[in-house]
Structure formats: structure tokens, C-alpha cells
Amino acid sequence: FTFLWAWELMSVFSWALVLTHDYASENRHAAYIYLLMASFGSLMLLMAFGLLAGAEGAYQFASIRETSRDEWRAGIALVLVVFGVGSKAGLVPLHIWLPLTDPAAPSHVAALMSGVMKKVAIYGFIRIVFDLLGPPAYWWSIEPITLGAVSALVGVLFAIIQDELKKVLAYGTIENIGIIFIALGLALAFKANGMAAPAALAFTAALLHVLNHALFKASLFFGAGAIIAATGEKSIERLGGLIKLMPKSAILFLIACIAIAALPPLNGFVSEWLLFQGILLTPALPQWGLRLLAPVAGIVFALSAALGAACYVRVYGISFLGRARSKSAEHAREVDDWSLGAMLGLLVICLSIGLVPGLMIDAISPVAESVVGGRLPVQHFSQWLTIAPITEVRSSYNGFLVALFVMISGLTAYWIVHRLWPRP
């Protein structure tokens, strides 16, 4: 019960943080919707633990591991767990609270909830499903893969049409939670079939994306807070021209957008690239249903990644480029150095992971080995810092070479433009 007690305590603290500005009726509404969904999730988890404890009623994790159960009862518990953690993480269709709470909460609170508290749900899923349920059946993976793919697509489709900046980020969280669940579902499928190396690849991709999303989403919320503090505007349609008035914020926000759009050489690309490598291994699965489901999830994942990149191009272009479209945007001023420093610190880590991902992959590998029974080859001693999660012949990535190519291409384009069309 310690797990559920801490789970409920986190829900209450999150509710209180959303109510920081409790004078607004929409904030109170968002907070109570969140509390309602959190209570539903706790009920689902309580029922799941009741099934796992069996007739003995032993709720210690060690006792649950030793309790014998058939795969169908464990599968029912899995369904309850997915609904329980999904209501906390923001999986579709349990996401209704998320686009309400993130815009209602102060930006630093939204950064904390998106970067940390929603990730506790991922921990809960891993702890229960991979640790307590026992050896998995292959069909257990169908639910997380399906809900993950639906969440990724629904999240990005709603994000791309939003007018309010923090709502864009909220729906972007739904998309990324979906990506994480696709990876965890694949890890379950591979583990159930005794494919330790592909399971380690998918699981590593999931954990790395958990970290990456926490970093770049927190920096984006800090950036959104800087924009709102400088202009008082929440709608991106009333912004524009901020790159001239807030140049430091503009550069940092651009880097964060590149990271969440999964473009190299930032960290978001690495975890999504690893997941694509895992999807490419699914034809080796023996079950025809999984061989059909995994490519469909891969197509949805690729589509959501492309739409996500378009979404953040739209957000950045409307907010920072062009001319100001309101008086408040015309009089915007750069935020203080402490706010900029918070964004900069997170983005330095994002860039470091993107350039040298092998260090983080090697740090995750022992966890993957203990959970799925396999690990990726050691990466950070690879030649020229190239990562090759399977074999160098099959696939490899070098963040430094990509960064060098981007830098040379950018400087060359800049030189050509100014050479051919010099300023008068």
C-alpha cells in the first residue's frame, strides 16, 4: 500500500499546484477534473493489486512476485494497470484533464508536472507490468502499442490546431506519452518471445525518451512562461516579431523546438531513432498479429513525428517571426537572466545527449538488462562516438558528424545568400 499511498499523495500535491491561481474559475475546474481522473486511476490500480495479491491478500511486492497466476488473470490486471497509469500519464482516451491543467497551472508547475509527475506513471507501468505480473504473454503488448499509437496521433493532430501556446505543449505531451507506450509495448512483445536484444533496444528507447521529453518539454514550458510574462498573451495569434525584442529567448526556444521535433543533432532524434530501429526488427516476431500491428504503429509514429515537426515550425514562426500582431507583443521585453539560465541549463543537457548519446544509452543498459533480460552493446567507446544499437552494418548514428554537417551547411547557405543578394 506504500506505492498507492505515495501515488495518491502525488495526486493531491499536483491538484494543489494547479490551484496556485485559484481565483480563476477555469483553474478550479481543471484542478477538480484532474483530481477526478487521478481518483479513477487509483481505483484501477487498487483493483489490479487486488487481483495480483490473490486469495492470500499479500500486497508486498515480493509476495506478489511469488504468487502463481495464469496469464489471463495477469492480462486482466494489465488492462487495469494501463487504465490506472494511463489516467495519470495522459493516454487517450484518459487525457481529458491534461489540456486543462497545463494551461491553467503556472509555467514552472506545468514544467514539473509534464517533466516529472507524468513520468511517475511510466515508472508505475514498468514496475507492475515488467516486474510483478510475471513472464509476459505476447498479447499483453497489443494494448500499450495500440493506445500508444492512438495517443501519438491524436495528440499531435490536436496540437497542430491549437491557438494557445501552453495547450500546444499539453497536447504535445500526449503525443510523446504515446511514443513511450509504443516502445514499452514493443519491449513486452520482444520479451514475451525471448528476443532479449530487441527488447533491450525498445526498452532503452522508451527510457531515453522519458528523459528527453522531461528535458525539452520543461524548457518549452519555461519558454512559454517567458513569452506570457513579457507580453501577457497566451494566444500565439497575438504574438509575432518577438525575435527582435526577445532574441535570447528566441534562440533558446528554437533549440527546444528542434529537440521536441526530433531533429538531429538534439536528443529527441536519438530516442525516436532507436524506436524506429526497434520497429524494423518486428518482422522477426512469430505472431502474425504483432507483425501486422507493429508496422501500423510504426506508420502512425512516423506520421506523428512529421506532424510534430510541422507543429513546432508553426508555433515558432507565428510567435517569433514576422511582425507583432498586438500592442502587447510590440512592447515585449527580454526576461531576466535567471529565467534564461533555467532554459539554457536544460538545453545544454539536451545537446549533450544528442551529441554523445552513447553515455546515456550505457547508463540505461543495466536497467534494461534487469527488466527485460538483455542490454545493448557498449556504445560510448565506439569509434568516433558512433552509436550502433544492433550492428554498424545495419544502422549507426554519429551526433558530432551530423552537427558538423548542419553547421557547415548553414554557414555555406548564409555565405551564398549574402554573396548573391548583398544588402544595399
Residue ranges and their predicted role:
Residues 242-251, 304, 308-424:
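Cytoplasmic/organellar membrane-interface segments at the starts of transmembrane helices
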Residues 2-4, 12, 69, 94, ...:
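Intrinsically disordered regions, especially transient/low-confidence alpha-helical propensity segments
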Residues 1-3, 13-334:
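Hydrophobic transmembrane alpha-helices and their helix-loop junctions in integral membrane proteins
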